[in-house]
Structure formats: structure tokens, C-alpha cells
Amino acid sequence: MKERGYIEQLWREEKYHVLLHSQQSYQMIRNALKTDLSLHQIQQMIDDALLIEPSIGSVCNAFDHMWGYFKKCANEEERQQSKLLKADFINGKIDTQTLLDFLAELANKYDVQYLLQSRVLNTKRKR
């Protein structure tokens, strides 16, 4: 595989992980992908983004983006659970990992390979 292929694969695996930490970094990396930066440079940008402490807003934004994969296939109970979990997260009743575990369950149930291959759903966080 050529370096560009590795860069695209890396971004597929990391984009929601980056978005969880920082929308600004996400946008910056998306723009950088339109240039001729090397795999090493993109990896460094991703690593730097993952050092940023996620905010409530960044977690909710990433959750909403990933939830979009299920909007049409989720049943009513799952839709309600999604709203409840997001509200509980905003109010400090649950942590980020609980939201991600819910999305991982749906990704498995509905076989959403793009999300299943995303590192954000395969990385356990401190509670």
C-alpha cells in the first residue's frame, strides 16, 4: 500500500477519536489531509489532538456524529435510550465510556463496520 493509503486508513480509524477530543483538531487534520503531509506528520497531529482533554461539547458532538449511523435503523427504545444517555452525560450522571459502550453495542448489533473499525469504540477510558 502506498503512503496515501496508510494515511487514509489511519484517518478512518482515528477520525471519531480525534473528534471526541477536539472539533478544532478534527477540522485542522481534515484540511491537512488535502495537502501532501506525510504519514508521520498526520500521526503527530492525531497524537497531539488525543492529548486534549475532551469537553462535554466535544463528546456530545462525536456522539451525535456516530449516532447518525443508527438514526434510520435504531428502534424506538434505542432512540429513547440515546436521548436519555446523552442527557445523563451532560448532567454528569454517566461518563464518556458509557456513551461509547452504547454506540459499540449498536455498531455490533447493526454491523456498522466503519464504526467497528474505529479506534474510539475500541479504546477503554478511565471512568
Task: Outline where the language-model segments fall.
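Acidic, Ser/Pro/Thr-rich low-complexity regulatory regions
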Residues: 1-127
